[in-house]
Amino acid sequence: MDNLVVLDFGSNSVRFSINQITGKNTFKEILRRKATTRLAEGMGLTAGEKRLTPAAIKRTLAAVADFKKIYQQYSNYQVVGIATAAVREAVNRKSLIDQVYQQTGCRLQVLSAHEETYFDYLAVMNSLLLKDCLIFDIGGGSCELALVKSGKFQTGVSLPFGAVSLGEKFTAANLTAAKLFALQTFLRKQFSALFWLQQASDLPLVLLGGCNRSVARIKRTELKLQPIDSFHGFKMTTKDFTEIYQRLLGLDNQQRKQVPGMEAMRSDIILAGMTPVILLLQQLHCSQVVFSESGAREGFIYQQLSQ
């Protein structure tokens, strides 16, 4: 195997990357693609069992078909796949898993909450020069927090909400003052139960996830930094992060789509994705955030290569 193809099924988007194996425990990403499929769409609106909708499955399989046309052009490759919160929580996940297998020959590995958190840790530790930090990955259907001290994983948690599910629950596309208050109250209750979070006071907050990537793009566009998508290790003060949040709060969804650097497909959920960060920055008195392009997918690759 020269190339490892990784399919990554998230709650908001499905991604794939082609990674050239360059040596023991080392790889070089040579291609990355993404399709916004909103796999978790509708899952947070009903009580009881969570189900992937037929429309979301159809969008996702269409994206996989497009990806397959690309990776088949490469030689000597192996296809592996991971899935996170949306698939993990869906009672009908087998339907998607079976259809992906029929389409690609790849049997999806549905990551447990702990695996997703730990793979975030592996990715950050192998790609950023940080020894002490709090890692915060905001996905579409879940949030992962990992406390790192002296480069070692201390503790972590996966919380069962993310930008898509929070956006649906609190109507974040058109966030009223009442909805914002309800969202903040909900999040404070979740964070207050994590007593170990206080050990992260004053540490850098490492941010992963699509909404956080959008914030980095907005700031890099403001600063005229090129390329705007190259933000691994990019740092932003808490003051600057808060200013962007406050500015976006004052805009409606159509206006947010026009903000330079904003991904139009995230304009309706970005406030739901930023609000948990704002509350943590306030609670832990963090002075800055650091953005990571590497997440659970890259951590999964490191784990695969170490076996």
Residue ranges and their predicted role:
Residues 37-39, 138, 161:
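Hydrophobic residues in beta-strands and at strand termini
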Residues 2-101:
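Conserved phosphate-binding loops in N-terminal lobes of ATP-dependent enzymes
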